[in-house]
């Protein structure tokens, strides 16, 4: 290990001392092409962004292509032509434009989008809408780390709880094909008007191994980690079930009004979801991670490695048309909070 450290230090020193950059403008006349981007959610109509590419050294004010003809095919059958819509926000910000579908794709649909422009040519993208993940069970394992109690003397009091929350999501991989997922969450309640405030702590990405499955041993040694990245595949549990564990540190619950344990008026909740995503989206997310956080991406930025080629499922090589299907669950912490509050109240008597 000591020898490895010396090699790493020597390599980093070499990169630092010898790296250089030089502006380079290739004398090529690369024509602009169509760029397609969309996130298609099962069961919902979708919006498609149609823009054109441009030279990095010659930026354009608005790359939107508003006169394209966009056709949608589902399972090899023509369904509709998407309608161009330009909305102008009331706050005066730049207009938002997209091509909108009336059709709501279902899981299993094979979608083909064909866009044509007289000026920028044609672009085609294909994607299959995945099925929602099978989540068999979701359970919470909270653990109190500290408490604070203040008796106001008039029958009311204030309580502040700090706790760690582990949420275990049992995902069943029932599909024989490869599957790709994104885990997400939201604080489902912050009800100050009812006399309490619940704050969900930060997710400990290192507590769940699948969040770092894309990181090589070498990248780990060089300091890469999975912070901020909750994308994973079923490579570790293909055809099986997997207990995904989300650990949140430094959660808090604060109650500052009088309360009656018999009242059932507060339900601090956490909304968790698992998306089954298309491979086109998974590939792009992995590419984006390597560019921003990977060691090879960092070397490429300074000319010591080949540039990482962007991922695209559009025929022109520009843009990503992705699809997803979501399974969401709500985790109610009411019973845990009530039991803890009652224990605190009894201990004060």
Name what the model sees in each region.
Residues 14:
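Short, surface-exposed polybasic-aromatic patches that bind anionic ligands, especially phosphate groups
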Residues 1-2, 21:
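N-terminal hydrophobic targeting signals that begin at the initiator methionine
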Residues 21-349:
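A sequence/structural signal for flexible, mid-protein segments enriched
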Residues 17-19:
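C-terminal motif of bacterial Sec signal peptides marking the signal peptidase cleavage site
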Residues 4-10:
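Sec-dependent signal peptide recognition
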Residues 2-3, 29:
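Extreme N-terminus of proteins, especially the signal/transit-peptide cleavage junction
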